[in-house]
Amino acid sequence: MSNTIAVIGATRGTGLAAMRQLIDAGRPAAAVVRSVEKGRALFGDRASVVYGDVTRPETLTEAVDPDWAAIIFTVDITGGIGGRGMFAGRERIRAVMYGGLVNTVEACKQRGFQGRVVLLSTIGLTLPSTGMSILNWIKSGLRDHSLDKAEYLKKSGLDYCIVRAGILNDKTGGAHALSITARDWPLQMGYQIARADLARVLIACATEPTASRRELSVFWAETGHDSDEQLAAKLAALAA
């Protein structure tokens, strides 16, 4: 098995942040993208760029390398240029959010992938809140799609880690310690995290032995910064 970490959803949001951190750290990385041209424009020759569309299973079978150490799956319904349509119908949203993960898992099985799949999810899926109600309305059925894909991954037989993130923002990372717990939390403004900090957690969960077959919630705690050792210790505490 190689040390390569692949990111599916690598050209936007948290997936893009994860790719940049891997590249900046000099770690081998692969971006699975719908637009190879866009991927190469973003990453040049600093990372492997392979074509794969989560709504087209045959492309994932071609894309997945069984020697990858891990796959970080950050695919979501987004708006804007190149997005998949934030206000799309429920079936379209499910095809991307749930179907995309299912297609990825099945491609991994077909290819004999033995690494870990790290799934980005959200806090608040099991706890009622105004925030979740709004998000579930904007992205029709998000709650069910998210719960269903997590269950599918857990029952897949693959190694996994499911990371439930607080409300995302684009602030500079590294300015807060992180709260990492096994329990769910309501989707409220008091539980936020920068995409940069979340990307760091996703990368750690891809390789830390104690993150294997775990579900965790992560958001900012007090002002400060967790060293790599402190982050690893917080993940290890979940297994204690």
Regions found by a protein language model. Give the residues of each.
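Structural motif
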Residues: T4, A69-I72, R116
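NAD(P)H-binding glycine-rich loop region in Rossmannoid oxidoreductase-like domains
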Residues: A10, A31-R111, T210
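NAD(P)H-dependent oxidoreductase Rossmann-fold/reductase module
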Residues: L168-K171, H176-P186, Y191, D226-A240
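Glycine-/Pro-rich loop/turn segments that contact NAD(P) or position catalytic residues
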Residues: I77-I180
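N-terminal Rossmann NAD(P)H-binding glycine-rich loop of SDR-like oxidoreductase domains
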Residues: N3-R27
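Core catalytic loop region at the nicotinamide-binding pocket of NAD(P)H-dependent oxidoreductases
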Residues: C205-L231
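Conserved beta-strand positions in the Rossmann-like core of class I SAM-dependent methyltransferases
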Residues: A6, A30-A31, C161
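Substrate-positioning beta->alpha
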Residues: H145, V163, L187-A204, R214
